[in-house]
């Protein structure tokens, strides 16, 4: 299976949008906080381009349009156990009038809470190991190294 993962970023406000969802993995491990912060993510449908899936997922899970999509990387999150393949992106968005709330596709059983957070805070969370979803950490650290390039576009 293939999935697109997107970290929505507003370079003018220097803020990111994170989604928060209940996840069965942390719950089954006995984690005291099974609601986790994540990038927007979703499976790529048959015949769909990863970029198109990324834009669709941002709209479904956060209710906003992506103005520009910047590819970070792609690869296997766990090649020893699965064939899953991730396409990771930064999605340039305008968060100036955005109202965080509850989003998701009801037919898919999604119950997604969105949060708009200052990038410096998310970077601090990443460095201090408070973000427990590893692809999100990769995306945040990539953005820390490359956001000046994104701001100049």
Where are each of the predicted segments found?
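Short, well-ordered beta-strand micro-motif
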Residues: 8, 90-92, 116-118
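A short coil-to-beta-strand element that immediately follows conserved catalytic motifs
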Residues: 65-72
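Conserved Nudix-box catalytic region and its N-terminal flanking loop in Nudix hydrolases
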Residues: 1, 7, 12-56, 106-108, ...
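Hydrophobic pocket-lining residues within nucleotide cofactor-binding pockets
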Residues: 11, 44, 66, 93-94
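Helix N-cap/coil-helix junction residues
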Residues: 63-64, 150
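Active-site-adjacent beta-strand/loop module that shapes the phosphate/pyrophosphate-binding cleft
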Residues: 78-100
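Membrane-proximal helix-loop-helix units in multi-pass membrane proteins
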Residues: 58-62
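Nudix hydrolase/Nudix homology domain
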Residues: 32-35, 46, 71, 79-81, ...
């Amino acid at each position: 299976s293939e999935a697109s993962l997107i970290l929505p970023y507003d370079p003018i406000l220097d803020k990111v949008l994170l989604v928060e969802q209940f996840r069965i993995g942390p719950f089954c491990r006995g984690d005291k906080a099974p609601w986790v912060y994540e990038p927007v993510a979703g499976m790529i449908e048959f015949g769909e381009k990863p970029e198109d899936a990324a834009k669709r997922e941002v709209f479904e899970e956060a209710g906003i349009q992506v103005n520009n999509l910047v590819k970070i990387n792609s690869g296997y999150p766990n090649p020893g156990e699965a064939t899953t393949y991730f396409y990771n992106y930064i999605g340039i968005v305008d968060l100036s009038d955005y109202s965080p709330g509850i989003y998701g596709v009801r037919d898919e059983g999604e119950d997604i809470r969105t949060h708009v957070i200052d990038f410096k805070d998310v970077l601090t969370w990443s460095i201090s190991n408070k973000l427990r979803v590893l692809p999100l950490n990769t995306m945040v650290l990539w953005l820390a190294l490359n956001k000046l390039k994104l701001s100049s576009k």
